[in-house]
């Protein structure tokens, strides 16, 4: 498909997808115009003076909307360690309230991922984070194309769940000691097109 997109007589290429695919399309487009809507890996930073309830609400809407399948959704949470326990407890409590099921049911908050393969990829990413030392505080289970809203603690900035975009309902928490450390962690992802 990529060959047909790049090699055709179209005047402009427009693609939505992963950063890797976007880089490939851009590198082969020659002098043709390219518009790319690529994945993101957006942090939500919660500093010690934050309104914790508002921050939790930001995660609930940003990490779990459309089962976490939003390119500009919250993909990692960077929290000052002085408020991390309170923030994490509230986030876990709210996450446990999420009803997963048929999206046609008005009470359902979390539906399926795009397909079972996507849910397996999220499951693998979370399992790898756990093997590397992360702890599942709630969620972490897959049933077909469903994947539970998941909160991960003990996450480090070098884990795949942080470095790469996890396209599912996962909220990895990274604790920091200072504002400077929080800011430095916002930049620790794979390179993207700017």
Predicted segments — roles?
Residues 144-147, 164-170, 188:
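Conserved glycine-rich beta-strand-loop-beta hairpin in the small C-terminal domain of fold type I
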Residues 128, 162-163:
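Conserved ANL (AMP-binding/adenylate-forming) active-site segment centered on the GW(Y/F)…HTG consensus within
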Residues 8-9, 13-22:
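Active-site phosphate-binding strand-loop segment of PLP-dependent enzymes
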Residues 174-176:
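Short acidic-hydrophobic, aromatic-tinged amphipathic segments that line or gate anion-handling sites
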Residues 20-156, 178-180, 184-185:
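ALDH superfamily catalytic-core signature
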Residues 1-7, 12, 187-194:
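Single conserved hydrophobic/aromatic residue that forms the stacking wall/gate
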């Amino acid at each position: 498909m990529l060959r047909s997109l790049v090699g055709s007589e179209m005047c402009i290429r427009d693609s939505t997808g992963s950063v890797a695919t976007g880089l490939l399309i851009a590198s082969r487009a020659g002098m043709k115009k390219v518009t790319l809507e690529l994945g993101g890996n957006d942090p939500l930073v919660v500093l010690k003076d934050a309104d914790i309830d508002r921050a939790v609400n930001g995660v609930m809407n940003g990490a779990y909307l459309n089962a976490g399948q939003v390119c500009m959704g919250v993909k990692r949470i960077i929290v000052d360690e002085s408020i991390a326990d309170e923030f994490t407890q509230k986030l876990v409590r709210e996450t446990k309230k999420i009803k997963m099921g048929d999206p046609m049911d008005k009470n359902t908050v979390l539906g399926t991922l795009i397909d079972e393969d996507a849910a397996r990829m999220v499951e693998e990413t979370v399992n790898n984070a756990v093997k590397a030392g992360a702890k599942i505080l709630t969620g972490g289970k897959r049933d077909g194309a469903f994947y539970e809203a998941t909160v991960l603690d003990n996450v480090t900035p070098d884990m795949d769940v942080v470095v790469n975009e996890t396209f599912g309902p996962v909220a990895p928490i990274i604790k920091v000691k200072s504002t400077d450390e929080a800011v430095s962690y916002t930049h620790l992802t794979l390179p993207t097109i700017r």
